[in-house]
């Protein structure tokens, strides 16, 4: 279980780093399905927030490398990713659907955190509960 969780976190860190760097250096036109040429303010904000996305990826990588010592951060990683999916859903409800390639991204942003938390719960919380009950 621990190695599965570790590899999921490494994969998440890699995808996040690639997409973060892509937007940081490519701006709005680097987003899949973009028609290019975004307003300067939108491009500016996207590049700014891409740095936080990169930091999230680095954090996922750090937790994966030190998973036994840093397991307590796993629920936060899952929660942030899930809330990102909620952000996409709010956008769809507010301004309409994005490019079709981003719909699977939103679905993954709901599914992956649930899987991460499920593995976390089974590996860490369940064991802690067993130990405190003396079984």
Identify the residue ranges that each predicted region occupies.
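Membrane-helix boundary elements
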Residues: 4-8, 13-43
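Core segments of alpha-helical transmembrane spans in multipass integral membrane proteins
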Residues: 14, 18-22, 42-64, 79-83
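Structural signal for membrane-spanning alpha-helices in multi-pass inner-membrane proteins
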Residues: 20-23, 60-64, 88-91, 116-120
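Membrane-helix boundary connector in multi-pass membrane proteins
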Residues: 86-103, 121-122
């Amino acid at each position: 279980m621990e190695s599965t969780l570790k590899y999921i976190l490494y994969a998440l860190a890699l995808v996040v780093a690639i997409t973060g760097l892509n937007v940081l250096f490519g701006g709005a036109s680097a987003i899949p399905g973009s028609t290019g040429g975004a307003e300067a303010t939108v491009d500016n904000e996207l590049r700014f927030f891409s740095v936080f996305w990169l930091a999230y990826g680095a954090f996922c990588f750090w937790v994966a490398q030190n998973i036994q010592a840093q397991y307590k951060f796993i629920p936060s990683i899952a929660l942030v990713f899930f809330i990102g999916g909620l952000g996409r859903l709010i956008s769809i409800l507010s301004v309409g659907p994005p490019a079709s390639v981003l719909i699977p991204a939103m679905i993954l942003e709901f599914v992956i955190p649930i899987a991460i938390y499920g593995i976390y719960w089974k590996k860490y919380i369940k064991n802690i509960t067993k130990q405190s009950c003396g079984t």
